[in-house]
Amino acid sequence: WVSKQDAGDAKMQELAGYIADGAMAFLKAEWKVLSIFVTIAAVLLAYSGTIHEVNGKPIHSSWIIAISFIIGAVFSATAGYIGMKVATKANVRTTQAARTSLKQALKVSFTGGTVMGLGVAGLAILGLGGLFIAFLNIFAGLGVDTVKTAIEVLTGFSLGAESIALFARVGGGIYTKAADVGADLVGKVEAGIPEDDVRNPATIADNVGDN
């Protein structure tokens, strides 16, 4: 629904395109670093997981915890991608809608935010529910407390999702402030032009950080 709204004139769409491209470039750069962290963390979890004794034989659930961690990280990154995509689409459409009425602008912006909120909740339920059912079936024939063990290994999913969200939040915050200060120094201090002026190229980076 958000994508179907009026995106404004050619100049607005051009600027929105620059911001969207910058946002995707930021995500790709962030994912490269996070993929290294996820790989190292998953290996450590695989070697330091829980061992269950079943009929005198050790049953290692550590590798399942590591897989849960990776799946949680992927789901969290997917939620971030969806949110960034929708945000960059909703921005320019909210601006165009504000030219007609405040009600329409609020509707477009609120709907764009709703997509992210429901996307996070939906992916969390899908991931936790799907893995819980899968783990119940995996541990069913091993002679262990299936529910307890399934919940135990699900902590890997939560850890993966929270880790990516934390790094994305902190990394995005640092980028936002760096871009904001840089744009202000170059624009207002050196060039003497207003804040967020289209003549300042750093404004694009500033708006990427705002997303």
What are these regions (language model features)?
Residues 1-211:
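Hydrophobic, small-residue-rich transmembrane alpha-helices and their short perimembrane loops
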